[in-house]
Amino acid sequence: MAKRWYVVHAYSGYEKHVMRSLIERVKLAGMEEEFGEILVPTEEVVEMRNGQKRKSERKFFPGYVLVQMEMNEGTWHLVKDTPRVMGFIGGTADKPAPITDREADAILRRVADSGDKPKPKTLFEPGETVRVIDGPFADFNGVVEEVNYEKSRIQVAVLIFGRSTPVELEFSQVEKV
């Protein structure tokens, strides 16, 4: 039987703990043959904290762990009896349904792509109001006109002397209002 990807519902905030517990339990039970990868899909994000750029991880699916496994009575019980696991997502309680290969590939591709360049933690949309927190236009409010995620820059229309003036800023220089 081929290994398929299943989504396991874990306590929110304990996804990494559940992942480590599952890996350990699989080894202790000698079931490495029935299990493949066990992972918490995350991406690296950059945020500003106290004027410093900090890298952190953001989970794609908070509260969920992806498990590649052959579904049988033994593997089902091993996962279900792991502390802080609430159960499987999809199918029925005693016969969980795997996610499609296309869904699994999309998630794995997204995880692989996220390692290339960290994304900003805050996403900006054209038309939304932001406050400039750094630079010559600090404390001005403006409307987002364009967002360039490759360069981590944002074009904001700031009202100066009663006229709308486009200003190009870095993500770290603005915050959502």
Swiss-Prot record:
InterPro entries: KOW, NGN, NGN-like_dom, NGN_dom_sf, NusG-like, Rib_uL2_dom2, Transcrpt_antiterm_NusG, Transcrpt_antiterm_NusG_bac_CS. Keywords: Transcription, Transcription antitermination, Transcription regulation, Transcription termination. It comes from the Bacteria. Residues 126-156 form the KOW domain. One of its GO terms (biological process) is regulation of DNA-templated transcription elongation. PANTHER family: RHO-INTERACTING TRANSCRIPTION TERMINATION FACTOR NUSG, TRANSCRIPTION TERMINATION_ANTITERMINATION PROTEIN NUSG. Participates in transcription elongation, termination and antitermination. This is Transcription termination/antitermination protein NusG. The lineage of its organism: Bacteria, Pseudomonadati, Pseudomonadota, Gammaproteobacteria, Pseudomonadales.
